[in-house]
Amino acid sequence: MAHTFSCFADASLVRTTGGSVRGYRFDGLDIFKGIPYAKARRFHAPEPAVWDSVLDATSYGYVCPLLEMPKPNGEMLVPHRYWLMDEACQNLNIWTPALDDAHRPVLVWLHGGGYFAGSSIEQIAYEGENMARLGDCVVVSINHRLNILGYFDLSDFGAEYANSGNAGGDDIIAALRWVRDNIAAFGGDPGNVTVFGQSGGGAKVTTLLQTPAADGLFHKGIVMSGVLGRLADCTGSGRDCAEALMAELGAADIAALETVPYAALAAAYNKVAPALKAAGKNTGCAPHPNAFYLGDPLENAFRPETARIPLLVGTVFGEFAAFNGFGLNKAQMSAADLPFLDVLFREPTMRYIRRRAETGPVWSYFFNQDFTIEGGRAPWHCSDIPFVFHNTELVPSANISGVTPQLEQQIFDAVLAFARTGNPQHSGIPTWPASTPQQENTMLFDSATRLAPNHDKALIAAALPAISALMARNFDPDSIQH
């Protein structure tokens, strides 16, 4: 296949609120990578980024440093990419069909990895080219602060650290403000922004709905495997963790922690955090409920200000089937094993959908397609991402003879229909009504896509008590790295 590329001084040049940026033209798209949307001191709120000369936006920006070096995990199933890490990671990428005034729908991708890992380019399936070209939309992906850089509560140490436990969420909001103020120059509609994400990225969508500062910055949300029943408890003070870090590093105060080299900070954290976590202390790495973030809606109710925002919410059948010790092919799993593999996500997702349906439109989906790789596998956590981005061609494990082309188009068209109209219905799938508090109208996406009201409700309810007890003993969500 022949490709076209151009990058000239006067081409793909856009003036933004921070300064001018130059991207490049590739196969009919204007592409911009690594645009700074903010800057921030460690543990502090982000501020707008500005520059004087034309910024070269032709390569990806830094990604957030991790607490541990990434380990290859399931590369055949979820191909990864790794990149330069630095705390100056507040940057975004844009794919757009044209720099015009077409006011295309805008889709802003929030990456997975919990709140402690991942990046905007971690998975090859995150590439926005096909979505932008085939969907005639503008795709944005962002990097932001993670782990103790983004979610370390230091509010006990002074007003300047009042929201350090949500610095990563504050970065995301800064990126959405940048999109609001600049995306029209990239051919997008600032009045039609959909935030979508998978796993930790999906959880970030639910967090934004509970964050008043995000109001008006997005208009629809897609939550893919993002409602998890058991996360780290970050409701308490982070004082104990901070004091343990200061003692380990010989730092006199929090200001000294701001200047410690990140590698030393991460090493100290990895040394002191396990015992603190075991003792039930707040060790960071997840949003901290306060006036900025109002907490999990399943515990604290949905905010009325965002209750009418349309949502598309779902999971995949296997979820952690391929990770965290569940590396079994389908022939090795008994019927009793299978509910365990999806109930961690599916059960709280079902509750979320029903509760959300009390106040606003929400559509339910379930990715149910088995794969042929390694003798046959149930769909795993992340296996739906290539279908959403129309990127199955980039992920060999996603290619199923006689199935993938149609299934990919069904899912992709549902996502684009939702981004355009707030309803995922399109001509290539059965009638798909929104869910109600009494009935979860779930679209099962597989080789025979169909609507399945209240899918697996009775099965999961019956299995939940035993499974919950097992998970409480054996499951640590921080151990998952995809």
Q: Residue spans of the language-model regions?
A:
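Non-catalytic accessory segments of hydrolases
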Residues: 1-166, 190, 375, 398-411, ...
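Active-site loop->helix "elbow" adjoining a glycine-rich segment at hydrolase catalytic centers
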Residues: 112-113, 167-171, 199-202
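Catalytic nucleophile serine of serine hydrolases
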Residues: 197-200, 212, 225
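Mobile gating loops/cap/lid regions near enzyme active sites that modulate substrate access
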Residues: 35, 324-325, 350, 354, ...
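Alpha/beta-hydrolase fold nucleophile elbow
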Residues: 105, 186-198
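Substrate-access "cap/lid" subdomains that shape
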Residues: 181, 215, 220, 224-354
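Short glycine-enriched nucleophile-adjacent loop
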Residues: 202-214
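Alpha/beta-hydrolase active-site loop
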Residues: 162-184, 240
